[in-house]
Amino acid sequence: MEDSNAAYTAYQSGDVLFIKDVPTQEIPSLQGNPEFHVEPNLGTYYLSMNLEDPAFADVNVRKALSLAIDRDYVANTLMQGTYSPAYNLVGEGWVDTDGSSFNANANGGQSYISEDFDANLEEAKQLLADAGYPNGEGLPTITYTTNDAGYHKVVAEYLQQAWGELGINVEVNIVEWSSFTPMRRNGEYMVARNGWVGDYSDPSNMLDLFCTGNGNNDGKFSNADFDAAMEKAASTMDTAERSAALHQAEDVLMEQVGCIPVAYYNDFWLQSEKITGIWHSAYGFWYFMYGDIAE
């Protein structure tokens, strides 16, 4: 069923026993329900900035936009806990070369972005002033482009308010999905919603997106140090060197704000307790080959 409300109605009536598209307005009433499942997904919800636009030429502007976002509020209030706050690009579940958590090892074990939002907001205001735009004065209106599915519209409205706290005027441009992806790919935007779900758990699968010339590099991020680190990671046979190179690449990406991580994906779904033997993977798939339905 393409209509999540119709699917939910069918689930409630017992016509179906499993739905993966739960209407977001129903989530508050489902908290604590054993049939409502939320599990991590190897993916990150992030913002792409069109780095060919002069408005984003100064890294301090990009940092200010990132710091002005209260990620905990976005993930746990706007997204109702169905996402997790993202303080770096590569989230939980991605595996370092020694089998440990790449996320836990990032930046010496410290978050790239402080979880102290009040301090972040003050720093954002100062960075914007340092870039020559005190209280947002002189910075052109930012157009934020997204499609209208799930939480995308409420996130857009939040960003309009959050960046407004910096004195930045933001216009929200909501387009149909069929138009959205080509617009983003062709650079027909200023800031746009983006995201990636991993094909496999090696962090290069996420970081490769930002290599110069990558077809999925919608923001056109290009940095020689980043590219060199990714090339080192791809060519070395030494696992410790490869790990160091991948972490160096993420360090550069985060320092240069090649994108703005917002939240880590989780999958959420409704599954009747009558269903047994199926499982969910962090790649966003459900496996039903050993499933059964108890009568």
Predicted regions and their residues:
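Ligand/substrate-recognition segments at binding pockets and active sites
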Residues: 115-117, 121, 127-198, 265-267
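Long beta-strand-rich cores associated with HINT superfamily self-processing modules
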Residues: 269-295
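Structural transition elements
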Residues: 84-130, 149-153
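Extracytoplasmic/peripheral linker and loop segments enriched in polar/acidic and small residues
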Residues: 116-118, 169-180, 205-273, 295
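Periplasmic-binding protein-like
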Residues: 29, 35-50, 52, 56-98, 155, 213-227, ...
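Ligand-site clamp/hinge motif
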Residues: 1-28, 160, 169
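Ligand-binding "clamshell"
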Residues: 27-38, 186-189, 202-217, 272-276
